[in-house]
Swiss-Prot record:
UniProt KW keywords: Cytoplasm, Hydrolase, Nucleotide metabolism
Protein name: 7-methyl-GTP pyrophosphatase
Gene Ontology BP, a term: nucleotide metabolic process
Lineage of producing organism: Bacteria, Pseudomonadati, Pseudomonadota, Betaproteobacteria, Burkholderiales
Catalytically driven reaction(s): N(7)-methyl-GTP + H2O = N(7)-methyl-GMP + diphosphate + H(+)
């Protein structure tokens, strides 16, 4: 009886944060950039947007590499039911953090795993509730000058100095806030045929 094929793993993302998280598994993988329009659709909730984009990213890369197992992920920060995107610049980051101070923000982090050749396709969503402290304008300014998190949904990096902005974090998948829920990702890539612990 022949050994099952050990498929190649591909991360469908250019995010350095997701790459670093997946590398923690100590299994080989490649990175490919998904060509996906990330615009929200009319009436789409932040949760729906994160799920749709995670699957779209995985499918876009899987179409180029049909024999591989592809991981796609997306994160949308949600405040009062509205999506907060990546700020992109200092002024927008200041505005986001001013909006979020003293409030709870839900980070919707979706992950999808796809293999075209086997027909495998799964998706899951991790919701992280982040409670922000009542921040002063001076604290916001000092944080942004120190860490420049303009490429992060919600204008903060919890894995760095951004932790000082928070009162508490409530979730069941610790890395979800950084951009890739690794408990869910491990479960799905193993179901797709990737050996994580060599067993």
């Amino acid at each position: 009886m022949s050994e099952p094929i050990q498929r190649k793993l591909i991360l469908g993302s250019t995010s350095p944060y997701r790459r670093e998280l997946l590398a923690r598994l100590r299994i080989p993988f490649e990175v490919a950039a998904p060509d996906v329009d990330e615009s929200a659709r009319a009436g789409e909730t932040p949760q729906q947007l994160a799920c749709r984009l995670a699957m779209a990213k995985a499918r876009a890369v899987a179409a180029q590499f049909p024999s591989c197992v592809v991981v796609g992920s997306d994160q949308v920060a949600e405040l009062d039911g509205q999506a907060l995107g990546k700020p992109g610049n200092h002024a927008r980051a200041v505005a986001q953090l001013q909006q979020m101070r003293g409030k709870s923000v839900i980070f919707q982090t979706a992950v999808a795993v796809v293999c075209v050749e086997t027909g495998f396709a799964q998706m899951d969503l991790a919701q992280v509730k982040v409670n922000f402290r009542q921040l002063s304008d001076a604290e916001i300014e000092a944080y942004l000058r120190a860490e420049t998190p303009y490429d992060c949904a919600g204008s903060a990096k919890s894995e760095g100095l951004g932790i000082a902005l928070l009162d508490s974090i409530d979730n069941d998948d610790p890395t979800a806030l950084v951009g890739l829920p690794m408990i869910r990702t491990c479960r799905m890539i193993q179901a797709a045929g990737i050996k994580v612990l060599g067993a």
